Amino acid sequence: MLIGVGTDIVQIPRIEKILHLYPELFAKKILTSKELKQFALLGKINHAAFLAKRFAAKEAVSKAFGVGIGQGINFKDITILNNDLGKPIVEVSSNYTNKLSPFNIHLSLADDYPVCVAFAVIESSYNVIRG
């Protein structure tokens, strides 16, 4: 059963400006501890694109859940990692997922300066959302 679909587009220069003003604060606001470890391994030239993709991905996932960031789910509730082939893998905090039946999140990310886009699809193997 389809739970939802979400998409988001982010202008990478917008993130570059935020990083210039708040170099560490912005990353700590939107990234989980696992993502911060990946972020620390990147060269500074890749920081803005990495953050833009994570921001867009988390917005897309929250929209697919039907709520949006700050309306029942937060940036820190969603972790975006990559498997060995680079495929994005989404982890959602149990604080949020306890309300849902088992589900799968499919996420696609793309960037071509100056924009990046994220597209998320959430599906469940059950027809019921627990309340």
From Swiss-Prot:
GO molecular function, one term: holo-[acyl-carrier-protein] synthase activity
Annotated EC: 2.7.8.7
InterPro entries tied to this protein: 4-PPantetheinyl_Trfase_dom (IPR008278), 4-PPantetheinyl_Trfase_dom_sf (IPR037143), ACPS (IPR002582), Ppantetheine-prot_Trfase_dom (IPR004568)
Single GO cellular component term: cytoplasm
Catalytic reaction annotation: apo-[ACP] + CoA = holo-[ACP] + adenosine 3',5'-bisphosphate + H(+)
Subcellular location: Cytoplasm
Binding positions for Mg(2+) per the UniProt entry: D8, E59
Gene Ontology biological-process annotations: fatty acid biosynthetic process
SUPFAM superfamilies to which the protein is assigned, alphabetical: 4'-phosphopantetheinyl transferase
Keywords: Cytoplasm, Fatty acid biosynthesis, Fatty acid metabolism, Lipid biosynthesis, Lipid metabolism, Magnesium, Metal-binding, Transferase
Cofactor(s) in the UniProt record: Mg(2+)
The keyword Lipid biosynthesis appears for this protein: yes
Function: Transfers the 4'-phosphopantetheine moiety from coenzyme A to a Ser of acyl-carrier-protein.
Family: Belongs to the P-Pant transferase superfamily. AcpS family.
Protein name as it appears in the record: Holo-[acyl-carrier-protein] synthase
Gene coding for it: acpS
